[in-house]
């Protein structure tokens, strides 16, 4: 079997390609830019093309897998269809792979997927269960974004964008939260809730639907779900109640869980913030229903120390801590900055790169209220990702909204100018956070360069 991946350099596509190589398939693929992920695939025997051309679809290719970002008029996709190749989108292909595993776990939600998938993977890996893992970030424990296991356990992120996760075949599904996002595809929150409801209905009756019971939209996704529903959260009506929350001197969470009247004891985390207590609680419940004993879960959850671009320490400038975070939704920004505030630094700087024009425009009001915990805010240009500039939204619009809300915010276009400004103004004991799903991390890297 010869499989070609259009957009093979993506975090999920590269992971699927690696799984196929491990299964003994011939793998080729194309992407627009070089990356370390492509180098890794080359080392494993994949044929990689830079640039997407119809000639890349050779006669011996049997199947072509493509991402949601690939346009219908893509040269390779058109050529594959003209040559009558088997064509499958990424999510459908991943769903087919999931069928091969007895215990497949899908982690979904508007935000927190990568952190929670990584937490859950850490619990399973250190329990010697040898899971196959697909994660949307760089998890040091597995040396990247994918690990090929030799067991019936499969752990993956599940994204709602373009209803991708409706192609999956999970036995356990987690929903961390349900909020407005991806409004270039969904018409609004009602359509998003309907999608998550369909996701829940994918589960078999013997499966588990583990959901954040404190989320205001969660009850609207439960209609006709056949699996066992486990709600977790701080509200006493939940099945798994999070209690006695506090933080150590480093800002790491400590909490207890009471499940169906039984005290599961105290859990200690090695990551920051209330949001990670919620993430961890879902991972704990998924591990518990998978048959992992409580003490193993308790020990292993503390081992997890984060994943790349999730409150990742990049180093220091002078004596100021420099951190990078993937936060690109208002709720994520609030959670990240709230966790940062607990570290009690002198001045909290946030350098934010908005991600996509659609998200920035549709959530402009929410973004304008997401930075209150920050003392100084720098906004740079919107990262387009898959979109074209519609001309009706600009980062300066966000800066103006922040100014109206009495947030100390400025706009700086170029990364180099941001770094120069920071070097001139950051003081000892400050905390600098770069935030966004685009390449804003480069500002942090440049700032800490010697």
UniProtKB/Swiss-Prot annotation:
GO terms for biological process: cell division; cell wall organization; peptidoglycan biosynthetic process; regulation of cell shape. Pathway: Cell wall biogenesis; peptidoglycan biosynthesis. One of its GO terms (molecular function) is ATP binding. ATP binds at residues 109-115. Coiled coil: none annotated. It comes from the Bacteria. Keywords: ATP-binding, Cell cycle, Cell division, Cell shape, Cell wall biogenesis/degradation, Cytoplasm, Ligase, Nucleotide-binding, Peptidoglycan synthesis. SUPFAM superfamilies: MurCD N-terminal domain, MurD-like peptide ligases, catalytic domain, MurD-like peptide ligases, peptide-binding domain. Signal peptide: none annotated. The keyword Phosphoprotein does not apply. Gene3D superfamilies: Mur ligase, C-terminal domain, Mur-like, catalytic domain, NAD(P)-binding Rossmann-like Domain. Its EC number is 6.3.2.8. Its main location: cytoplasm. GO terms for cellular component: cytoplasm. It catalyses: UDP-N-acetyl-alpha-D-muramate + L-alanine + ATP = UDP-N-acetyl-alpha-D-muramoyl-L-alanine + ADP + phosphate + H(+). Belongs to the MurCDEF family. Cell wall formation. This is UDP-N-acetylmuramate--L-alanine ligase. It comes from Clostridioides difficile (strain 630). The lineage of its organism: Bacteria, Bacillati, Bacillota, Clostridia, Peptostreptococcales.
């Amino acid at each position: 079997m010869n499989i070609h991946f259009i957009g093979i350099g993506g975090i999920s596509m590269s992971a699927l390609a690696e799984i196929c190589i491990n299964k003994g398939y011939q793998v080729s693929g194309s992407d627009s830019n070089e990356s370390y992920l492509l180098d890794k695939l080359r080392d494993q025997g994949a044929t990689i093309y830079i640039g997407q051309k119809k000639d890349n679809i050779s006669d011996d290719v049997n199947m072509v897998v493509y991402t949601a970002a690939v346009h219908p008029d893509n040269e390779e996709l058109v050529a594959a269809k003209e040559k009558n190749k088997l064509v499958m989108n990424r999510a459908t292909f991943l769903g087919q792979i999931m069928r091969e595993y007895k215990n497949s776990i899908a982690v979904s939600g508007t935000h927190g997927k990568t952190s929670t998938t990584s937490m859950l993977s850490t619990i399973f890996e250190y329990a010697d269960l040898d899971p196959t893992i697909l994660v949307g970030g760089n998890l040091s424990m597995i040396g990247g974004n994918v690990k090929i296991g030799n067991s019936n356990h499969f752990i993956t992120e599940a994204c709602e964008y373009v209803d991708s996760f409706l192609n999956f075949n999970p036995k356990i599904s987690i929903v961390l939260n349900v909020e407005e996002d991806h409004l270039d595809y969904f018409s609004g929150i009602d359509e998003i809730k309907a999608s998550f409801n369909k996701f829940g209905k994918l589960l078999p009756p013997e499966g588990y639907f583990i959901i954040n019971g404190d989320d205001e939209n969660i009850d609207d996704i439960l209609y006709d779900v056949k699996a066992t529903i486990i709600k977790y959260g701080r509200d006493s009506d939940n099945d798994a109640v999070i209690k006695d929350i506090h933080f150590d001197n480093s800002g790491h969470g400590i909490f207890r869980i009471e499940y169906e009247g039984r005290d599961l004891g105290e859990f200690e985390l090695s990551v920051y913030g209330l949001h990670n207590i919620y993430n961890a609680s879902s991972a704990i419940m998924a591990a518990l229903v998978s048959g992992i004993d409580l003490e193993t879960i308790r020990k292993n959850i503390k081992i997890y120390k984060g994943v790349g671009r999730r409150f990742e320490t990049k180093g220091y400038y002078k004596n100021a801590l420099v951190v990078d975070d993937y936060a690109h939704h208002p709720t994520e920004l609030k959670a990240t900055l709230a966790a940062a505030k607990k570290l009690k630094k002198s001045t909290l700087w946030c350098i934010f790169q908005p991600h996509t024009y659609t998200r920035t425009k549709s959530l402009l009001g929410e973004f304008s209220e997401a930075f209150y915990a920050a003392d100084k805010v720098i906004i740079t240009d919107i990262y387009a990702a898959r979109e074209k500039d519609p001309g009706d939204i600009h980062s300066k619009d966000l800066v103006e909204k922040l100014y109206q809300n009495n947030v100390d915010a400025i706009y700086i276009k170029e990364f180099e100018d941001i770094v120069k400004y920071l070097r001139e103004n950051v003081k000892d004991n400050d905390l600098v956070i770069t935030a966004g799903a685009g390449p804003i991390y480069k500002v942090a890297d440049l700032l800490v360069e010697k």
